[in-house]
Every structure is written in C-alpha cells, then in structure tokens.
C-alpha cells in the first residue's frame, strides 16, 4: 500500500523539478530574444534546441487543427494567458502551457518572409524539425478575453476572425514578395479609385466594393478577365509604367443603337451587355490568351473554364486602344472554376509533386473563397437596401426591379435563355451515327428476334431532344388546355408510337420506356420555358419604360366561379401589344385591397413600381386601391353595362310602374332562348361580337327586333302565335332605338386593333345628347330616357385621361366638346405633361440628391419656361387643321415627334391604354383555367405558368 504513495512522491518531485527547469529555460529564452534583437540572430546548435525542447515539452498539451483550404501553419503560444494563471509557491504553474499547431499548407513556406522568426531561439532547426510548419511566435497575444495581433495590434474576440486576419497577413507577404520595399507602408493601390492601403486585408475589403460595379457580360471569350486582377496594382509596377492620360471615372454617355434589334441606350455598359444577349456566351475550344511576353508564362491552364458568375468588363485603357499593364492583362486564373476530375488528372499527373500543382490547388481554394465572399457581399448589399428607393438593375438588359428576389428570377431567366441558345448552335450528330444505332434493330426485324435486344436505353436520347419534345408537348397543351388528360391517354401514346415506328427505317423503340409519362416530361420543362418567355416579356415591357404602360385587371365569370386576368398593354411601333401576366381565381371575399396587392406583386416581377401606369378595372374591383399606384380608370363596357342594368332591372321598373317594359323583356328572353329556333334563324347582329362584360338581356331584345319578320314567319308555321301577339312592337322599336347606339358604342370601345381611349369622352357626349333628345317624347320612352341620363352621369365617369386622349386624336381634338370646356381640357393636358416631364428629362435621374435643394431656386425660372413651352406646343397643335380621313394614330405621332415632342410621348403612352378591360379571348381562357382548377389537373402555380405560355408564346 506504501508503494504507490512512494512512487507518487518522486513523481511529484520530478514534476516540480521539470516545472522549475521549464521556467528557467523560458527565462533563458527571453534573455536570448533580447540579446538577438541587439546583436542579431545567431545559429543555435540542434542539440541545445533538442535538450531545451525536452525540458519544455514535459507538461505541454498540443492541439492540432486542419483547416479546409490548407493555410500556412501557425503555432499558438498563450504567453499572456499563462501570466494570469495562478502560480504555486515553488514557482510552478498549475495549468500546463497550451500550444495549438495548425497542420497543412505549402512545405516551402515557414514564416511570413520564408525565414525563421527573428526572436526564435531555434533558428534554422524550426524548418528542419517541422518540415512544412512555420511558427509565428508574435502573431497571438491573448489578453482580457481577446486575440491581439502581434503585427498590427488589432484585437479580435473570436478565434476564426483572428485566423482570417492572420491569413490576410500571409497573403500580404506572399503578394509583396521578398524584394518588396519595407519602407513603403501603403503598398496596395486601387486603380479604380486610387485609394492606398497598408494592409492587404483592408485592401481586399475595399476591392470587394468595386466587384459589383465592374461585373458585366461580354460576348467574346477574350474579353473575360479577372475583375480582381484589374483592381490589384503593386506600387513598383505602377512606377515602372508610363503615366496614362486622365480619364473621367464614370459611365460613358452617348447614343448607342443595337445593330441587331435597333434598341437605343444612353450608356455604353447597358448597350454592351444588351449586344451580348444576341451573341450568347460560349466557350470556344480554340481560344487562347493574347500573345504577350509578360503574360504568356502565367497562363498555364487554358482549359480551365472561366466562372460564369464573375466576368470582368474592359478597362478604360483597353477601350482607349492603349496597351494595358502587365498586372492588368495577366491570365485571370484565380476566379476560374476547378476543372473536372478528368482534366485535373490530365495536367496534374506528370508534376503531382511540383510547386505549380500545389499553387494551383491553393489558387482554386482561394478562388472559391473570394468568389463566395464577393457573391455574399453582393447579396448583402442588395438585401440591406430593400427599404431604400434604389432599384435593382439587371446587368444583362438594364431592366430595373423593385425587389431583389425578382431580379434573381430574372437573371435565372437570362441564364436559361443563353443556355438554350448555346444548345441550338451546337451541331447535330451526323445521320450515319443514327443509322448505326438502328442496324441491330434491322437485324431484329429480319430475323424476328425478341424486342429486348433492340430497346434503346434512356440515356441514348440527348437532353436537347428531350427538351424539344417537352416544348412540343407544352405547345399542344397551350393550344387546348383540355388536352391535359389526353396527352397521357392510350390513344395519344399509340399515335406517338406510330409516328416513331413510321419514321424509323430499321425498327422502333418504346416511347413509354424512353420518355416516360408525357405530362411529367412536359411539366418538368415548364419552368424553363416559362423563364424563357418571361424574360422576353420583361425585356419588351422594360424597353418601353420611358413611355409608360396600361394594365387591365378584369374578372370573368363562368357559372358560379370567376377569375381575374391581368394584362399589360403598350405601344410597339404602330401597333398595340398585349401581354397576359397572370391569372388568379376570384373569391367573393376578395376585396379591392387584396386584388391590388396581387396585381402589384405580379407587376413587380416584370416592371418597376415607379413606371407610369394606367389601370383599367371592372366594377367588382374598387378603384380607390389602384389610385394610390397610378391613374385608375373604369372599364367603359362595364360602365355602360351598369347603366343599362340599373335602368332595366326589375326592381327599378316595378318602382316606376313600368310593367309593360318588364313583360316585353320577359317575352324577348323566351323567344331568344327557345329551343325550337334554328341557329340560322337568329343570326348574329354584328360581325364583331361585344365584350364578355356586356348585358345579355339587351342582346336578346335587339336580336328579336332585328329578326322580327323571320320570327313571326317561324311561329306562324309552328302555329304558336300567342308569343308574337303578346309582343309590344312599338315599345320594342323605341327601346331598340335607345339601346342600339349604346351597344354600338361598346363594340367601338372594345376594338382590340386600334386605340380606343380617345373615344370615351365623345361616346359620353353622344349618348348624353341621344337620351336628352328622347326625353322630350311622351310616354314610357321619356321616363326611360330620364332614367338613362341619371344612370349615365352616375356610372359612366369621365377621367381627365379620357379628355387628354381625345385631344391627341387629330381627327377630333376639341370638336366633340362645347367651347366652354376647351380651357379646362387644355389645362388637364398641361398638368399631365408636367407630372411626367421629370422622367422624360435625360439627366434628372443622375443628379445627386444633395444638389437638388440648392438648385431648386435656380430651376424655378427654367421650370416656368418649360411650362410655357409646353402650353405653346399644345396651342400650336390645336391650331392645325383637322384630319378629314381616319388616320393611324401611332403612325401620325411618329411623323410629328420632332415637331410636338411632349405631346408625342404622351400619345404613345395614353393611346396604348384600352378603354375596355375585358377581351374576347378572356372567356375561353377563364373557362380553361377553371376547368383545370375543378379537375385538379395542375397546381395553381403551374396553371398560371401554363396560361402565361398560352397567351404570350403562341
């Protein structure tokens, strides 16, 4: 029992002796460090270092860490931490020393300058003993709960942050080199803004700020350089280069016109990025960097593909035609993606142990770190400004978005579009290869073998062909949405199998095994095609941002269900182009605010919220919610329909004791809805059908009046004259005389091929005169006309936009309205011009916000002069003679744009806004959408995308 105790006592003595020995050795090391600072470093024998280490390693715990990117090694010595620990009476420390050794990195680098630390007593033995581990004694000073850098004095609370800072010091020394001048503290100069930095970590953070601004899209592969290579210019390199002429920092302005599509851009960068869309990015196999003696040796891996996320724009020196410095033109391999495994083995196997291969691995890790950091900085910069008024601009087409998520979806659409363009440019496989594939199946047919040997595996069909098949399937679905269930049916599969069998000369393969379920295949590629069409619609709407758009939100009912259809209109050339942006199932509980929020969310995916927008809604949607976002007009067909319904409703007629009118309407409905009448007996009243929001009761009354003779002949042969005898022909004629102009006005206002907004005010004036003239008659017709006048003033509201649009018609101008309203309408035109003139100004958007208050007083006379010129332009236009023939309005304003600039811009915006929100195709679209909803064939999101493709692709 005494043996363990006796053994423990000598062990304690040994530990105390070892502690005293380690303390004495630590004091000798400190004295030797002080002496080396004065006398210089002296070599220490290896034996002495080994003996000293054996004394100090008695009670030392060693921790090892392995970083992800194999950074250079750092040994942590907690000297400051040990000083705060409790010390026993005999001078020994209670807690042993703790050393953290980071293993890994390049073997040829031990310290920041490639040498042993100056204060290290080990000298050259450190390099020999650790063989690839460098000791940085003064890098860490742990005091008061923080990590302090021994080089620059910065303090960090967390170890990871401090490790990143030490890594930046490593990069600093690696970049500056051994021969760099230590006297020059500010060694890193930014060639973009000229700022200088002492430490590489600070310069790296500053360099990331320029990363978002210099990224753009270039069409040619040789223009894709590393943006960070353009930002890093060493001081010695700047001194050796000749001075360059001063160039203004900022975007280049001018008038740039695309030679492919004719779009114009004021700034060179959006124009350059737009031209790149016509020539998609592709990696040419024969591309090589320019032959430059200074840079040819640095580009050692031409097969590494450049990262598509970071493509640098041309520098100003390259644009001016001068030779760029060597630091700018060198091969940009830091941001290139790591090549595939096969390529990596190809050029790394011969020199697997060479420093070049290890440097390539370090550069690839550094590229991933820098690329991720720049991307995170880009996302944080955009996400931090969500509440600001600054828009998010697409670098490819220049379109602005209010929300950052919409910009990301738009950029993905560009990526999908470019990918498909690249795939379409690739050459197809030769026919000989296809014939070889079918040869085994030809033997099968001739020998009557089994079909198992001739089946083609799923991988034999290229992805491009599968995309083409999916596109055709989606086109079939868009042509008739009722074919969703037919596509997966047996008959359709048999038809597809027959087509494949007939097209193959030497056999066939199973369509079901190769393509699988057709619905699944089509819906798999639905988001890709949706993004392709969406980016085209976004570009089309964004190109007309300076003119404004018109947006209609109209509900269409089919039985008990209804849905909202959102459509955007704009002038493209001499025509009005419409785009269906979204379809949403309507609910009785949906208020005007809910519909307004849905409209704004959909519009934010295509256009900016600041764009000038005129909304056209139906009677179910409250105009107060939309008035906050822009001008809100009511559908003219819905307004006239409300006028007719309010007068001819049974409650109103009963209150006015007009029982004969009620009886007449009931008889007309019975005659028009009789099953014994053939279709040819009741033909259509007009070749152009009215919009779907028109009243059906009025149509039945007008139909009976027009086909009265045919109806009487039909019922006389059928010996059913009781219905004809109960029909009041005189009252029918008077009602037809009132309702026919109303329906004719609705048909004119619903014209889809010509502008219609300028016809609203003349229609109101014409109907008002008609009802006033008929009101002087006696009897029931007079009462009805008084009711029509009251309903017209209450339901058919005339907006100032209607008055301005009427003036913009050179055939009408102010002729339809009385003279006492001329000055009021001219004032409305001038007000509307003043409201939108700020967006027409070319330099207003780029004036700093701080300068606007100081220049407000100076711009007052200029604004007054501008108002006077705008008013004179309106009067000059009104003094011109009226057109006798009906002109093409867009063609007319295209010809007089130089003469009447402000009015022309106003005309291209307002005349594209329709007067009627509902269209003839809305009924069919709503029926198909509701059919999909009832049968649950698709999810609401997929249904919306499919309706979008149906409207904008076919």
Curated annotation (Swiss-Prot):
Residue spans of biased composition, Low complexity class: 1-19
Source organism of the structure: Homo sapiens
Any one GO CC term of the record: pericentric heterochromatin
Role this protein plays: Regulates UHRF2 function as a specific 5-hydroxymethylcytosine (5hmC) reader by regulating its chromatin localization.
C2H2-type zinc finger locations on the chain: 147-169, 188-210, 256-278, 392-414
Assembly behavior: Interacts with UHRF2.
Subcellular location: Nucleus; Chromosome
Biased composition (Basic and acidic residues): 366-380
The protein, known as: Zinc finger protein 618
Stored Gene3D superfamilies: Classic Zinc Finger, Zinc finger, BED domain-containing
Gene designation: ZNF618
Family label: Belongs to the krueppel C2H2-type zinc-finger protein family.
Covalent cross-link Glycyl lysine isopeptide (Lys-Gly) (interchain with G-Cter in SUMO2), where: 63, 81, 239, 437
Positions with biased composition (Polar residues): 340-357, 442-459
Residue positions where N-acetylmethionine is found in the record: 1
InterPro entries (alphabetical): RNaseH-like_sf (IPR012337), Znf_C2H2_sf (IPR036236), Znf_C2H2_type (IPR013087)
Keywords from the UniProt entry: Acetylation, Chromosome, DNA-binding, Isopeptide bond, Metal-binding, Nucleus, Repeat, Transcription, Transcription regulation, Ubl conjugation, Zinc, Zinc-finger
BP-aspect Gene Ontology terms: regulation of transcription by RNA polymerase II
Annotated region described as Disordered, given as residue ranges: 1-56, 282-307, 337-390, 421-463
GO molecular function, one term: zinc ion binding
PANTHER family reported for this sequence: ZINC FINGER PROTEIN, ZINC FINGER PROTEIN 618
């Amino acid at each position: 029992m005494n043996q363990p105790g006796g053994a423990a006592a000598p062990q304690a003595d040994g530990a105390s002796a070892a502690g005293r020995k380690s303390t004495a050795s630590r004091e000798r090391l400190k004295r030797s460090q002080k002496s080396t600072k004065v006398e210089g470093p002296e070599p220490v024998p290896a034996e002495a270092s080994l003996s000293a280490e054996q004394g100090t390693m008695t009670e030392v715990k060693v921790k090892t860490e392995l970083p992800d990117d194999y950074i250079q090694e750092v040994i942590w010595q907690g000297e400051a931490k040990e000083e705060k620990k409790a010390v026993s009476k005999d001078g020994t420390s209670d807690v042993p020393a703790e050393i953290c050794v980071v293993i890994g990195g390049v073997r040829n680098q031990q310290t920041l300058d490639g040498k042993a630390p100056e204060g290290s007593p080990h000298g050259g033995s450190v390099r020999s003993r650790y063989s690839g581990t460098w000791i940085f004694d003064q890098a860490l000073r742990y005091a008061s709960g923080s990590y302090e850098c021994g080089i620059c004095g910065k303090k960090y609370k967390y170890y990871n942050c401090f490790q990143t800072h030490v890594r930046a010091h490593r990069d600093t020394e690696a970049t500056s080199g051994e021969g760099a001048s230590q006297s020059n503290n500010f060694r890193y100069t930014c060639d973009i803004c000229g700022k200088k930095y002492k430490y590489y970590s600070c310069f790296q953070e500053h360099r990331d700020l320029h990363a978002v601004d210099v990224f753009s899209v270039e069409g040619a592969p040789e223009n894709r350089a590393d943006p960070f290579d353009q930002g890093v210019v060493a001081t010695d390199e700047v001194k050796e280069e000749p001075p360059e002429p001063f160039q203004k920092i900022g975007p280049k302005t001018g008038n740039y016109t695309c030679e492919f599509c004719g779009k114009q851009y004021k700034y060179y960068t959006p124009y350059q990025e737009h031209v790149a869309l016509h020539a998609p990015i592709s990696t040419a196999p024969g591309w090589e960097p320019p032959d430059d003696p200074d840079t040819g040796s640095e580009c050692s891996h031409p097969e590494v593909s450049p990262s598509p996320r970071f493509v640098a724009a041309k520098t100003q020196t390259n644009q001016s035609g001068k030779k760029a410095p060597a630091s700018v033109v060198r091969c940009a391999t830091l941001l290139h993606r790591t090549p595939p495994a096969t390529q990596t083995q190809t050029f790394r196997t011969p020199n697997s142990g060479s420093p070049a291969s290890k440097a390539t691995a370090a550069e690839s890790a550094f590229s991933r770190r820098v690329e991720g950091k720049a991307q995170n900085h880009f996302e944080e910069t955009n996400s931090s400004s969500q509440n600001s008024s600054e828009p998010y601009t697409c670098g490819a087409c220049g379109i602005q978005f209010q929300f950052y998520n919409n910009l990301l979806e738009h950029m993905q659409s560009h990526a999908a579009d470019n990918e498909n363009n690249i795939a379409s440019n690739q050459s197809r496989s030769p026919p000989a290869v296809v014939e070889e594939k079918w040869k085994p199946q030809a033997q099968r047919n001739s020998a009557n073998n089994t079909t198992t040997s001739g089946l083609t595996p799923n991988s034999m069909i290229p992805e491009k062909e599968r995309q083409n098949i999916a596109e055709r399937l989606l086109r079939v679905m868009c042509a008739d949405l009722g074919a969703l269930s037919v596509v997966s049916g047996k008959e359709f599969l048999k038809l597809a199998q027959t087509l494949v069998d007939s097209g193959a000369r030497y056999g066939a393969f199973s369509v079901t095994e190769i393509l699988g379920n057709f619905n699944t295949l089509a819906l798999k590629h639905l988001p890709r095609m949706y993004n392709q069409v969406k980016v085209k619609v976004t570009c089309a709407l964004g190109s007309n941002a300076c003119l404004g758009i018109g947006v209609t939100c109209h509900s269409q009912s089919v039985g008990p269900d209804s849905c909202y259809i959102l459509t955007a209109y704009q002038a493209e050339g001499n025509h009005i182009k419409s785009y269906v942006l979204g379809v949403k199932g309507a609910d009785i509980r949906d208020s005007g605010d809910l519909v307004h929020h849905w409209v704004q969310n959909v519009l934010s995916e295509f256009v900016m919220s600041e764009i000038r927008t005129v909304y056209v809604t139906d009677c179910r949607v409250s105009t107060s919610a939309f008035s906050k976002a822009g001008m809100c007009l009511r559908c003219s067909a819905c307004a006239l329909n409300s006028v007719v319904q309010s007068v001819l409703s049974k409650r109103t007629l009963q209150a006015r004791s007009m029982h004969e009118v009620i009886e007449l309407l009931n008889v007309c409905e019975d005659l028009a809805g009789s099953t014994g009448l053939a279709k040819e007996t009741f033909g259509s009243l007009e070749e152009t059908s009215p919009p779907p929001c028109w009243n059906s009761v009025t149509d039945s009354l007008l139909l009976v009046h027009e086909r009265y003779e045919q109806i009487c002949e039909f019922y006389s042969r059928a010996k059913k004259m009781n219905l004809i005898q109960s029909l009041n022909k005189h009252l029918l004629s008077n009602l037809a005389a009132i309702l026919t102009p109303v329906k004719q006005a609705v048909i004119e206002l619903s014209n889809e091929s010509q502008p219609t907004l300028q016809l609203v005010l003349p229609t109101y004036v014409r109907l008002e005169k008609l009802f006033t003239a008929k009101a002087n008659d006696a009897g029931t017709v007079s009462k009805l006309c008084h009711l029509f006048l009251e309903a017209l003033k209450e339901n058919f509201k005339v907006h100032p936009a209607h008055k301005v649009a009427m003036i913009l018609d050179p055939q009408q101008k102010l002729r339809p309205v009385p003279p006492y309203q001329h000055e009021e309408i001219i004032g409305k035109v001038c007000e509307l011009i003043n409201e939108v003139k700020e967006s027409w100004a070319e330099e207003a958007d780029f004036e700093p916000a701080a300068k606007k208050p100081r220049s407000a007083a100076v711009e007052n006379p200029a604004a007054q002069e501008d108002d006077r010129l705008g008013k004179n332009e309106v009067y000059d236009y009104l003094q011109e003679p009226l057109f006798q023939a009906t002109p093409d309005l867009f063609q007319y304003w295209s010809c007089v744009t130089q003469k009447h600039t402000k009015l022309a811009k106003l005309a291209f915006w307002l005349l594209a806004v329709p007067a009627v929100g509902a269209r003839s195709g809305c009924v069919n679209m709503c029926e198909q959408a509701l059919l999909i909803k009832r049968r649950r064939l698709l999810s609401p999101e997929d249904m919306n995308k499919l309706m979008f493709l149906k409207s904008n692709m076919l």
